[in-house]
From Swiss-Prot:
Expressed in kidney. Expressed in liver. In liver, mainly expressed in the central vein. Expressed in intestines. Weakly expressed in adrenals and in lacting mammary glands. It catalyses: 1-methylnicotinamide(out) = 1-methylnicotinamide(in); dopamine(out) = dopamine(in); serotonin(out) = serotonin(in); (R)-adrenaline(out) = (R)-adrenaline(in). A large substrate binding region with partially overlapping binding domains for structurally different substrates is formed by several transmembrane helix domains (TMH) including TMH 2, 4, 10 and 11, and it is alternatingly exposed to the extracellular or intracellular side during substrate transport. Amino acids in TMH 1 confer major functional differences between human and mouse orthologs. Residues 1-21, 172-177, 232-238, 285-348, 399-403, 453-465, 515-556 are cytoplasmic. One of its GO terms (cellular component) is basal plasma membrane. Disruption phenotype: Knockout mice appeared to be viable, healthy and fertile, and displayed no obvious phenotypic abnormalities. Showed slightly greater body weights after 16 weeks compared to wild-type mice. Reduced hepatic uptake and intestinal excretion of organic cations. Showed reduced thiamine and thiamine vitamers levels in liver and intestine and higher levels of thiamine and vitamers in plasma compared to wild-type mice. The keyword Ribonucleoprotein does not apply. This is Solute carrier family 22 member 1. It is a multi-pass membrane protein.
Length: 556
């Protein structure tokens, strides 16, 4: 009986139907970018200082320039050490409405030295130096409440983590198409609700909900396209589907520049996603899933439609189509199986560390550049562009060099770039951006390639479980990354870079402990997985990119 791949060889492995479905589903991949890293623009923290009653009126009466107003009325400007905290979170305890204040150095009549004047925390809000708005400026998430910005982004990654626990079941139980449509609808609704949230708490809950379903939408699209194409195109299609995410990043920079108000920006990236619901009429259910549910008639009908669109003739035995037999799947996997043998234990722990470290590096560099860049939009745009050559490097090296050395080298490059950024003076901003781009390119390569290696190191019956458990560390890394970046920057701006450098260099070193899987057949049993790297397999190399997983990172 012909398998799905056998039938695809007759009706077209990547014909007009697959190309159309690929382009449509890539739009879903691109739409995840504002959710994944939108914090850079939604949570942008501009220069700010305490609002003091009477200062604006005095400034107008005296005809001060903005720089003179700051110099006369804000403490800590130009000082070292705690200057940033003083100027942004403290104010002089002065009644600026009193008529005795002079227009030239008004505080000189109150104290010979400004440092002797008493200070107090901001009581009347803040003044922000920005033409637009962000969640920071609207909800005053600065000073003592600055950690709430970190929590906003952490909720997205927490949603990714929680969603990955149930999305797989929904997709397997009710179908890939239904999962795609339902998660897309909830993603769109929660995105709009985030934009109109009246307070911080409700905004946080809607953001968490959006994280829980948006990853499911991305994974469902990934699953559908990899199940529609033939095995020879599966790897390239999977990589290009992730490149669509990069297109979303590049586009996000332009949209954010055009719409500086965070609520309108959130609406601009959320409302168009309602159009994805039209996929109900354009994207069919996966024939593989239909066969797994014994719905052969529907699977055959879809294959006939694919053949018609591709102008191919379906095989005569199409109605006898079946799934590939895999006796190993009858064995029930358990978490303990991931640590059952010495090699499996080593592989699992290393893969967990790789997923965690590359997530911290990838998201951390994006946030650090956003917080320290001279031009937020251009820096984000340039650093996003480097993900295109990253995908090209993967396509070129994956079958020529292998997996392990490119992953190790990319980690080492990312780590070294972060450490070098510490020694670059602020005046050489272009060099800092260049190194940040280099580090991000390395992290991108690791994120995409570790997914492939993860699938190739485990035996068949625990391959899905191994991917779900290990890649969950990617979401956990994303939960902690905002706190690592923004809180450590309060201590020393370069401190997160030291952490990134250590993570990258150590990840590169431990990667070399993994066996090379290039040219080696996928292991079917624990014994074969245990012996990976100890012998050369003469079996035909597996050409499938990976088995579709529901626990993988949204960027991988």
């Amino acid at each position: 009986m012909p398998t799905v791949d056998d039938v695809l060889e007759h009706v077209g492995e990547f014909g007009w139907f697959q190309k159309q479905a690929f382009l449509l589903l890539c739009l879903i991949s691109a739409s995840l970018a504002p959710i994944y890293v939108g914090i850079v623009f939604l949570g942008f923290t501009p220069d700010h200082h305490c609002r003091s009653p009477g200062v604006a009126e005095l400034s107008q009466r005296c005809g001060w320039s903005p720089a003179e107003e700051l110099n006369y009325t804000v403490p800590g400007l130009g000082s070292a050490g705690e200057a940033s905290f003083l100027s942004q979170c403290m104010k002089y305890e002065v009644d600026w409405n009193q008529s005795t204040l002079d227009c030239v150095d008004p505080l000189s009549s109150l104290a010979a030295n400004r440092s002797h004047l008493p200070l107090s925390p901001c009581e009347h809000g803040w003044v922000y130096d920005t033409p637009g708005s962000s969640i920071v400026t609207e909800f005053n998430l600065v000073c003592g409440d600055a950690w709430k910005v970190d929590l906003f982004q952490s909720c997205v990654n927490l949603g990714f983590f929680l969603g990955s626990l149930v999305v797989g079941y929904i997709a397997d139980r009710f179908g890939r198409k239904l999962c795609l449509l339902v998660t897309t609808l909830v993603t769109s609704l929660s995105g709009v609700l985030t934009a109109v949230a009246p307070d911080y708490t409700s905004m946080l809950l809607f953001r968490l909900l959006q994280g829980m379903v948006s990853k499911g939408s991305w994974v469902s699209g990934y699953t559908l396209i990899t199940e529609f194409v033939g095995s020879g195109y599966r790897r390239t299609t999977a990589i290009l589907y992730q490149v669509a995410f990069t297109v979303g990043l590049v586009g996000l920079a332009g949209v954010a520049y055009a719409i500086p108000d965070w609520r309108w920006l959130q609406l601009a990236v959320s409302l168009p996603t309602f159009l994805f619901l039209l996929y109900y009429w354009f994207v069919p259910e996966s024939p593989r899933w239909l066969l797994s549910q014994k719905r052969t008639t529907q699977a055959v009908r879809i294959m006939e439609q694919i053949a018609q669109k591709n102008r191919k003739v379906p095989p005569a035995d199409l109605k006898m189509m079946c799934l590939e037999e895999d006796a190993s799947e009858r064995r029930s996997p358990s978490f303990a199986d991931l640590f059952r043998t010495p090699s499996l234990r080593k592989h699992t722990l290393i893969l967990m560390y790789l997923w965690f470290s590359c997530a911290v590096l990838y998201q951390g560099l994006i946030m650090h550049v956003g917080a320290t860049g001279a031009n937020l939009y251009l820096d984000f745009f340039y650093s996003s562009l480097v993900e295109f050559p990253a995908a090209f490097i993967i396509l070129v090296t994956i079958d020529r060099i292998g997996r392990i050395y490119p992953i190790a080298a990319s980690n080492l490059v990312a780590g070294a770039a972060c450490l070098l950024m510490i020694f670059i003076p602020h005046e050489l901003h272009w060099l800092n951006v260049t190194l940040a781009c280099l580090g991000r390119m390395g992290a991108t390569i690791v994120l995409q390639m570790v997914c492939l290696v993860n699938a190739e190191l485990y035996p068949t019956f625990i391959r899905n479980l191994g991917m779900m458990v290990c890649s969950a560390l990617c979401d956990l890394g994303g939960i902690f990354t905002p706190f690592m970046v923004f809180r450590l920057m309060e201590v020393w701006q370069a401190l997160p870079l030291i952490l990134f450098g250590v993570l990258g260099l150590s990840a590169g070193a431990v990667t070399l402990l993994l066996p090379e899987t290039k040219g080696v057949a996928l292991p079917e049993t624990i014994e074969e997985a245990e012996n990976l790297g100890r012998r050369k397999s003469k079996a035909k190399e597996n050409t499938i990119y990976l088995q579709v997983q529901t626990g993988k990172s949204p960027h991988t």
